[in-house]
């Protein structure tokens, strides 16, 4: 396989890994990176979905101790069962709404104005959330969340169906606005990502299975590997970062990126559509 093509796959994997779990929208960045690299045909869209697997593996690795302890304790400890139930409850709203509205959203909302607007609006929402009263925090750990907390975060996650919103951004900032600490909101967002990304990925790959080929296996393997490594580094960095910093820098970045979306769409350089 062409070395240049494999290099492009590596770059796309890094972009996916670095942006999947930051509140900046991986989809928007993959579209822009694909346009820059000339890696934006139908097969590239399937590739973008497939390399999310690497990011999922990274989260599982970072949180493996918690996941393992929960699985072992499920038969005997109510606390473990409640945590697992919370993840399931948070996951279900996105499943239901995706099945009902997924096609309509892809057909009508993937436009430059919508993508740019959600980037910019999301930036201002982050600024607002970070300036809320310190006393608003009532949940310091994911283990202290109630099923209602999980349901609310799950409903907020549905906003990520709108292009440019960012799944991690919606769940983290939504969780903070609902009273979760920055750490608890981030942790739950990452746990929620595991079933959400697996479900969305399997469903999308099944629909586009006619575009898959064994000949592309090296391409997908390279992208997945680089996605895994970069996502692992990014998640570990973010967990350290949030202990002493806010999400404000990401807010300004989103606003700036929204302007980039409008500029590239206006010049015709990037096709922000399905």
Curated annotation (Swiss-Prot):
Keyword annotations: Antibiotic resistance, Cell inner membrane, Cell membrane, Cell shape, Cell wall biogenesis/degradation, Hydrolase, Membrane, Peptidoglycan synthesis, Transmembrane, Transmembrane helix
EC nos: 3.6.1.27
Protein location: Cell inner membrane
InterPro entries: UppP
Keyword Cell membrane carried by entry: yes
Topological category with respect to the lipid bilayer: Multi-pass membrane protein
Record-annotated membrane-spanning stretches: 44-64, 85-105, 109-129, 159-179, 185-205, 215-235, 247-267
Domain of life: Bacteria
Catalyzed reactions per annotation: di-trans,octa-cis-undecaprenyl diphosphate + H2O = di-trans,octa-cis-undecaprenyl phosphate + phosphate + H(+)
Entry similarity comment: Belongs to the UppP family.
Name of protein: Undecaprenyl-diphosphatase
Gene: uppP
């Amino acid at each position: 396989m062409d070395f240049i093509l494999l290099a492009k796959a590596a770059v796309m994997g890094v972009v996916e890994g670095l942006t999947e779990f930051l509140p900046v929208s991986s989809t928007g960045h993959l579209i822009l990176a694909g346009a820059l690299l000339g890696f934006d045909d139908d097969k590239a869209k399937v590739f973008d979905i497939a390399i999310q697997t690497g990011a999922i593996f990274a989260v599982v690795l970072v949180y493996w101790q918690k996941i393992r302890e929960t699985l072992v304790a499920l038969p005997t400890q109510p606390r473990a069962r409640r945590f697992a139930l919370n993840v399931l409850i948070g996951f279900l709203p996105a499943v239901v709404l995706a099945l009902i509205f997924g096609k309509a959203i892809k057909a009508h909302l993937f436009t430059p104005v919508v993508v740019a607007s959600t980037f910019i609006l999301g930036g201002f929402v982050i600024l607002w959330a970070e300036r809320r009263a310190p006393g608003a925090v009532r949940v310091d750990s994911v283990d202290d969340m109630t099923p209602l907390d999980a349901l609310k975060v799950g409903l907020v996650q549905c906003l990520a169906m709108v292009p440019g919103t960012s799944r991690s951004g919606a769940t983290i900032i939504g969780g903070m606005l609902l009273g979760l600490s920055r750490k608890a909101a981030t942790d739950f967002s990452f746990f929620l990502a595991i079933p959400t990304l697996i479900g969305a990925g399997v469903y999308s790959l099944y629909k586009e299975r006619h575009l898959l080929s064994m000949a592309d296996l090296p391409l997908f393997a390279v992208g997945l590997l680089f996605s895994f490594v970069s996502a692992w580094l990014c998640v570990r960095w973010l967990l350290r970062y949030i202990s002493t910093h806010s999400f404000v820098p990401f807010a300004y970045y989103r606003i700036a990126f929204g302007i980039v979306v409008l500029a590239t769409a206006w010049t015709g350089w990037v096709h922000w559509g399905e």
